[in-house]
Amino acid sequence: MKNRTWKQKVGLRFAGTLLLSALLIGVTACGAKEKQTSAPAANASSTSAAQGEIKLPETLRIGFISANNNKTITGPEGWAQSKGYLESELKKYGVKEFKYFNFPNGPNLNEAVTAGTLDVGIYGDTPAINGKAAGLKTKLINISQINMNVWLVAKPDGPKTLADLKGKKVATSQGSYMSRYLISLLKEQGLENDVKVLHLLPADGEAALARGDIAAYAYPTGFGPLILKKGYVAIDEASKHPDLLGTSLTVVTEDYLKANPAFPKLWNDIRTRAVKEIRANSEEYFKLYADGSGYPVDVVKASFQIDQWPEEAFPAKGLTLVNATKKFLVDQGLAKKDFTQDEWIAK
C-alpha cells in the first residue's frame, strides 16, 4: 500500500510536470506571436507619444529683414513657408497661429525682441551679435546664410577707388553687416579718420547718391546688383575681402527656448529640408525669391549662389565668419561686451 502510494505520487508529480511544461510552451509561443504582431503598433504608438510630449505655444512670432517692406521671408524658411510645411510641421506640435513681422534693418528687430514681441529672429550677424553683447536674451539656433556680399557703390562720374573717398561722406545702414564691412574696409585702408560714415537705409541710398549728399553707399544683397544695373559702379565688394563677408543668423529668445527646448531641432529640420529642395530646384527658388523680394530674377542671381545656404545648422565657415565679426565689433568698441560663441549657441 505504501509502495503503491509512492508510485501514485511519482506519477502525479510527473504528470503535473508535463502539464506545466506544456502550459509554459503554449504561453511562450503565444507571447512570441503576440509580440511579433503588435511590435509595429508599439513603434507607431511611441512615435505619437514622442510628438505628444512636445507641446509648443499656440502662437509663434517670427521676425525677419525686408528692406523693401515685403511680407514674405526670402531664405529657405521662405521656401518652406511657400510650400506650406513651415506651418504644417509646427502645427503638429500645437502651433495654431503664425505671426510674421518684417523690419527694415537689424537694430529694429532687436528692439522688437527687447519689447517681447518676437520669439524668433532671422537677420544679419552684426545686429544679432550687438544685441547679444548689449544683454539681449537670445540663443543662436543656426547660421542661415554665409558669404553674404556687400557692394560699395558710387555714381559713374564719382570716386573710382577707395583712396578717392578721402575727405568725403559715405553711408550704409547702421548696425548692419554692411556697416561692419564698411568700417573694417576704411580701417584697412587707413581712411577711418578721413571718411565720415552716415546712417542711411538702403531704400534711401540712391537718392542721396544722385544728389551728391554722399560719395558712396555700401549696399546689401539685392540692392547692390539692382543699383549697378541702373548704371552705378562698384568701387569695392566684400567678396574681395573674404573675412568681411556677412552671415545671416537665426536666434530664439531665451524665454521661448527655456519653455520649448525641442524647438531648435524642429526648426532646423524644416530648414534643412528646404535647403535640400532649393538646391534641387534652384530656378524655381530664384523666382520665388524674386517674387518675395520684389527684385528681378537676374538681380537675385547676381546677389548670391545657392550654396550660400548650408544644410547644417552651424557650418565651419559660418562659425569662423561669425566669430571674426564678433571679435571686430568687440575690439572696435561697437559691441558692449564680449561673450563666447559656445555660450550663445542653443544646446
Region annotations inferred by a language model:
Residues 48-81, 175:
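Extracytoplasmic "Venus flytrap"
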Residues 56-59, 89-102, 117-119, 188-199, ...:
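A local structural motif
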Residues 126, 194-290:
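Pocket-lining segment of extracytoplasmic ligand-binding domains
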Residues 107-118, 133-135, 166, 188, ...:
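Short helices/loops that flank or line small-molecule/ion binding pockets
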Residues 154-170, 256-262:
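Flexible hinge/capping segments at coil-to-helix
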Residues 25-29:
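C-terminal motif of bacterial Sec signal peptides marking the signal peptidase cleavage site
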